[in-house]
């Protein structure tokens, strides 16, 4: 065995291990002091990024079961039954820290990592989404300019990787707030399709079965990445570029095809991608799930650089790599497949019955430790929590505390925020139509949809989160993220089934941040129980903080739903002039956390808009059932900016004017953000039946106007349609490209 390390205190500090954790390590190793390889392994496996040691106690309460759930949390991705022997495999993950340091590679490898999570399960990826948060991009300050640079780099990275892989990026969300000036958020979602009896898991079992390495060679890129992502940033953080992985989408495409060919054989027991902590996490997770032991010979791992050490091989986060537990005697068959695809492949070890990880370097043992305490029994922290001091002041304010703004002036200002306007500059850099399963172009649906060629159905998916809501009410805001993502799916005509989440929060060592996180988890749990949409996969990203300033709580939710008829995917833009516009739901004059207060007065304050799960479910039922029988021509949820902004979006994208007169108590209520509302387009012949259906469900329904004309007129505010279109379609590009 290698010798124990010198300068122990400095080594522990560099590896983000506490003295208490070192005492645990000594206990696990029966009093033996670990060498540098073993310290590196403990550091990675017990990092926040890999162990979830601050968050696990709160995640355990999530609902994860339903008749349609095949695989819940704990595997590479979640799996749900979508009928006729088919399953959808999906997950959302973060690549926040790497993307802030190196936006192109950080975002690109985030896409690569989530794609591997999907095809590792045996599924072919068929759709990507992303949820992106940036700081303030408007203005001439260095921060504004750098944020614009980050936007350009992240979008380029996502597009470059996804396009090369031949996987369509069909939707997502982009928002901006100064709370992200020091930490942007890059959350990637991917979904794949697989036959429900052909799913592969990340396990290693069977004494004597070989352990095989496939994919790219191992280099030093990404060393310490998991530990870096488990710490907050300072002004010097850009020096961490060496911890950011470098992606090669062409190699990943070869790896995808090779793996899918491999899955057609019965030559393997399990397979795991090498993500955070690289070979370390893959090996420990595969063996930890089954109670097996492993022997691995690190000198047999394909190397990209000379002079690499066992420490480098175990902790490198080089991309496009997999670890396989094969059936003994089938090695050559596997080697032939990967060599055909011009990928590296090597037998590097075998499964044992020792329940220990034994690593060798040219015959010398460099690691010997029990697997379970490292992979399954990482220390769980019970961090202190405290309700944030800012909340009392924030929720005490109402819209009435501000000077009245002329409604026309407000309308023109609320049309132009980057979170409102069209994101064609973003999604036109993504290939959204490759594989020819995308039902409609991005921007024309509240949820992105793909057809399932095997059974005539369609899958709808939507990512959502309003960080302003989560700032003023961490529990309610998180619950509303689930509600709103489900509402978007329902607006497309699909029934929401399950979620994956990406929980982005600040420094867990701050009791106020930990309280926000705990409350957010409670909100997600409550909403998923009430809406019957279990959590099947997810990710936690903490330490999104720079110089003591944390991001807004941002629990991004991606909802997946099923439409039984791919020919009945409901658009969110107007279809025919002369049709009626029907508003479903109550407008209550609620402005807490609203775009109205943020854009006009620069603050995020107020009480969260009220919502009721039963009413929300009735709204979903109305839209889904009315769409089935052909009563609806389009549907859009009412959210940020109220009915005025929702109607303006529908008008701009469809290039059709509108004349609307909605019943409101106060003229500014056309901008309020009351929940459980939708705008439905209904032909004259179907209007009475639609109104009867709404009444039968106890939902308020009001015919508020007609489609047609050259103006967008909502109550007392109006603009020429061409002006609305110019603002909507050109603002984003003008802002982001102003430095070029």
Swiss-Prot record:
Q: Which GO terms describe its cellular component?
A: cytoplasm
Binding-site residues for substrate, renumbered to this chain: 94-97, 116, 245, 317-319, 541
Enumerate the Gene Ontology biological process terms. Answer: 'de novo' IMP biosynthetic process
Please write the reaction equations for the catalytic activity of this protein: N(2)-formyl-N(1)-(5-phospho-beta-D-ribosyl)glycinamide + L-glutamine + ATP + H2O = 2-formamido-N(1)-(5-O-phospho-beta-D-ribosyl)acetamidine + L-glutamate + ADP + phosphate + H(+)
State its location(s). Answer: Cytoplasm
A Pfam family of the record is FGAR-AT_linker
Specify which residues bind Mg(2+) 1 according to the UniProt entry for this protein. Answer: 93, 539
SUPFAM superfamilies referenced in this protein's UniProt entry, alphabetically? PurM C-terminal domain-like, PurM N-terminal domain-like
List the InterPro entries.
PRibForGlyAmidine_synth_PurL (IPR010074), PurL_linker (IPR041609), PurM-like_C_dom (IPR010918), PurM-like_C_sf (IPR036676), PurM-like_N (IPR016188), PurM-like_N_sf (IPR036921)
The metabolic or biological pathway listed in the UniProt record of this protein is: Purine metabolism; IMP biosynthesis via de novo pathway; 5-amino-1-(5-phospho-D-ribosyl)imidazole from N(2)-formyl-N(1)-(5-phospho-D-ribosyl)glycinamide: step 1/2
Residue spans making up a coiled coil are none
What Enzyme Commission number(s) apply to this enzyme?
6.3.5.3
Sorted alphabetically, the keyword list is:
ATP-binding, Cytoplasm, Ligase, Magnesium, Metal-binding, Nucleotide-binding, Purine biosynthesis
Q: Which residues bind ATP?
A: 52, 91, 501, 538
Where does this protein chiefly localize?
cytoplasm
Which amino acid positions bind Mg(2+) 2, per UniProt? 117, 273
Quote the subunit structure annotation. Answer: Monomer. Part of the FGAM synthase complex composed of 1 PurL, 1 PurQ and 2 PurS subunits.
Role description:
Part of the phosphoribosylformylglycinamidine synthase complex involved in the purines biosynthetic pathway. Catalyzes the ATP-dependent conversion of formylglycinamide ribonucleotide (FGAR) and glutamine to yield formylglycinamidine ribonucleotide (FGAM) and glutamate. The FGAM synthase complex is composed of three subunits. PurQ produces an ammonia molecule by converting glutamine to glutamate. PurL transfers the ammonia molecule to FGAR to form FGAM in an ATP-dependent manner.
Family assignment?
Answer: Belongs to the FGAMS family.
Name this polypeptide is given: Phosphoribosylformylglycinamidine synthase subunit PurL
- Source organism per entry reads Sulfurovum sp. (strain NBC37-1)
Q: What is the lineage of its organism?
A: Bacteria, Pseudomonadati, Campylobacterota, Epsilonproteobacteria, Campylobacterales
**Gene name per UniProt:** purL
């Amino acid at each position: 065995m290698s010798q124990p390390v010198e300068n122990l205190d400095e080594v522990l500090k560099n590896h983000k291990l506490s003295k208490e954790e070192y005492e645990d390590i000594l206990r696990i190793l029966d009093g033996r002091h670990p060498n540098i390889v073993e310290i590196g392994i403990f550091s990675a496996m017990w990092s926040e990024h890999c162990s979830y040691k601050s968050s696990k106690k709160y995640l355990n309460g999530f609902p994860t079961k339903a008749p349609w759930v095949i695989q819940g949390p704990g595997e590479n991705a979640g799996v749900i039954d979508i009928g006729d022997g088919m399953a959808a495999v999906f997950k959302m993950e973060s690549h926040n820290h790497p993307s802030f340091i190196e936006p192109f590679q950080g975002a690109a490898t985030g896409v690569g990592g989530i794609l591997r999570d999907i095809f590792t399960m045996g599924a072919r990826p068929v759709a990507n989404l992303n949820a992106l948060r940036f700081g303030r991009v408007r203005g001439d300050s260095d921060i504004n300019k750098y944020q614009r640079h980050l936007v350009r780099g992240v979008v380029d990275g996502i597009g470059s990787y996804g396009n090369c892989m031949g996987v369509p990026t069909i939707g997502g969300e982009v928002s901006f707030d100064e709370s992200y000036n020091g930490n942007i958020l890059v959350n990637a979602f991917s979904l794949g399709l697989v036959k429900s009896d052909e799913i592969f898991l990340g396990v290693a079992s069977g004494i004597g079965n070989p352990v095989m390495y496939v994919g790219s060679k191992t280099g030093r890129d990404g060393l310490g990445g998991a530990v870096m992502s488990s710490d907050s940033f300072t002004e010097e953080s850009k020096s961490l570029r060496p911890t950011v992985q470098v992606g090669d989408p062409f190699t990943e495409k070869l790896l995808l095809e090779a793996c899918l060919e491999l899955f057609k054989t019965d030559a393997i027991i399990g397979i795991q991608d090498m993500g955070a902590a690289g070979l370390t996490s893959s090996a420990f997770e595969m063996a930890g799930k089954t109670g097996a032991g492993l022997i691995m010979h690190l000198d047999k791992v394909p190397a990209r650089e000379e002079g690499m050490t066992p420490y480098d091989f175990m902790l490198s986060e080089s991309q496009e790599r997999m670890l396989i537990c094969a059936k003994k005697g089938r090695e050559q068959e596997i080697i032939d497949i990967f060599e055909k695809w011009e990928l590296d492949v090597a037998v590097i070890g075998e499964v044992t019955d020792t329940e220990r990880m034994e690593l060798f370097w040219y015959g010398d043992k460099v690691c010997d430790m029990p697997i379970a305490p490292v992979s399954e029994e990482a220390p769980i922290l019970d961090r202190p929590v405290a309700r944030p001091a800012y909340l009392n002041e924030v929720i005490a304010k109402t819209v009435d505390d501000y000077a009245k703004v002329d409604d026309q002036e407000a309308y023109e200002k609320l049309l132009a925020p980057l979170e409102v306007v069209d994101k064609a500059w973003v999604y036109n850099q993504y290939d959204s139509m490759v594989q020819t399963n995308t039902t409609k172009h991005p921007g024309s649906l509240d949820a992105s949809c793909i057809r399932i060629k095997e059974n005539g159905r369609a899958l709808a998916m939507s990512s959502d989160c309003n960080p302003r809501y989560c700032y003023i009410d961490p529990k309610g805001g998180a619950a509303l993220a689930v509600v709103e993502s489900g509402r978007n799916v329902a607006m497309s005509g699909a029934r929401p089934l399950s979620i994956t989440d990406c929980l982005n929060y600040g420094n867990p060592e701050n009791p106020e941040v930990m309280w926000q996180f705990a409350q957010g988890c409670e909100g997600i749990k409550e909403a998923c129980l009430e809406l019957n949409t279990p959590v099947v996969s997810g990710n936690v990203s903490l330490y999104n903080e720079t110089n003591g300033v944390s991001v807004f709580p941002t629990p991004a939710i991606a909802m997946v739903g099923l439409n039984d008829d791919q020919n009945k995917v409901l658009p969110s833009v107007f279809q025919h002039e002369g049709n009626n516009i029907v508003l479903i739901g109550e407008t209550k004059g609620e402005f807490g956390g609203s775009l109205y207060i943020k854009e006009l007065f620069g603050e995020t304050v107020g009480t969260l808009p009220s919502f009721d799960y039963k009413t929300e479910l009735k709204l979903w039922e109305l839209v889904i059932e009315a769409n089935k029988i052909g009563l609806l021509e389009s549907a859009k949820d009412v959210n940020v900016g109220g009915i005025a902004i929702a109607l303006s979006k529908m008008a701009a994208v469809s290039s059709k004017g509108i004349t609307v007169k909605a019943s409101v108590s106060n003229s500014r209520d056309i901008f309020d953000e009351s929940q459980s509302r939708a705008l439905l387009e209904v032909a004259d012949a179907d209007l009475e039946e639609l109104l009867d259906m709404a009444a039968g469900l106890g939902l308020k329904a009001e015919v508020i106007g007609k489609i047609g004309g050259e103006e967008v007129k909502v109550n007392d505010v109006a603009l020429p349609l061409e002006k609305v279109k110019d603002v909507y379609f050109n603002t984003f590009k003008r802002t982001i490209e102003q430095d070029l």
